[in-house]
Amino acid sequence: MEITKDIRYIGVDDHDIDLFEGQYDVSENGMAYNSYVILGDKIAVADSVDAGFVDEWLGNLEAVLDGRTPDYLVVHHMEPDHSAGIAAFMERYPQAQIVASIGAFRMMVNYFGTDFSERKMVVKDGEVLDLGGHSLTFVGAPNVHWPEVLFSYESTDKVLFSADGFGKFGANDIEDPEGWACEARRYYFGIVGKFGKFVQAVLKKAADLDIQIICPLHGPVLTENLGYYLDTYNTWSSYQPEDEGITIAYASVYGHLKAAVEELASALEARGQKVSVFDLARDDMAEAVEDAFRYDRLVLASITYQGEIFPFMSTFIHTLAEHAYQNRTVALVEAGSWAPAAAKVMTKELEGMKDITLAQNKVTVLGSLNDASRAQIETLADELSK
């Protein structure tokens, strides 16, 4: 695929994968591992692909070289889905140099038993690789989302190579009917979300660049309305709500708490609120995390289980915490047969999160719904709808 006259796409699509990073469901739409070629007087290849696709990737590369030989392999990110082809590339093109951060070369020793010391070029923030007619200026992007990461900026065609930044789930040969944001959001908050301050730092650097195209390592090449993508990443990485709305995440066993959640959702919708509801035992928890970050209000609803909260709820709250969940209003719904304690436990688990405002009202379901708990639902719906 031609991105510009001298920049080509040589990535691959993976439709065999079911779980990305061993946990994120991509079984329906697969995954893309992106790689690019910059054809200047010298040729640079940007990143490789996952281990199962190295031969296909090298074939894609040969198809665009037109008999020429690459001079450089630029490694922006060492995660194996982007670095598995390094050794094969260096063997096939023995005159080529490898360009990466010092941290990436340290990782190469761990993965390949060598840092290619006779052929390596260490670069850091602000340094330039001149290809003749094109050049790459490197932008340090540590912890977006690994410590060795670099972005690079090609100044002639105004292209930002953004490593895992601006990536999304899904193969590139399938059109996503939901557009970019949904699976990009699930990807961001699942994989990059913990590192918001580092994303903010690299966005500040990028603000000084005239960016016309963004080439990420996953998902589509972004060529239009780039302000939208940059603004969205700024919102996500500053932990601000993207939209007004309420996510309800619940863990129910015998259906009594589920019934309370359904009544609460209906009461909120009747008050004009946008509501998304997740059964943490059955729905994709990564999507629940995604919507918890997307909206400005969250309801946690759990049964009391062995004096604590149900394990799926505990996992959900822990996942939010480790991804730096903050700046939201949280309401609690609890249930139990004799001594409901879930609200107390959830309150304690929320204590370490930054700028969390607990709703003044809660709902307690003792056994099953009754007039008292239904009245609490209405009161909570009023509070969350103000």
Spans of model-derived segments:
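Structural motif
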Residues: 42-44, 72, 134, 158-161, ...
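Short, charged N-terminal beta->alpha structural module
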Residues: 249-271
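Active-site metal-binding motif and surrounding structural segment of the metallo-beta-lactamase
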Residues: 41, 52-99
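Metal-dependent phosphodiesterase/nuclease catalytic metal-binding core
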Residues: 37, 151-215, 223-250
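Conserved beta-strand hairpin/beta-sheet module of binuclear metal-dependent hydrolase folds
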Residues: 2-62, 151-154, 158-162, 257
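FMN-binding flavodoxin-like domain, especially the glycine-rich phosphate-binding loop
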Residues: 172-214, 218-221, 263-278, 288-386
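Metallo-beta-lactamase
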Residues: 2-5, 100-149, 195-201
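Active-site neighborhood of phospho(di)ester-bond hydrolases with catalytic His/Asp-centered motifs
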Residues: 46-48, 70-78, 98-101, 160-164, ...
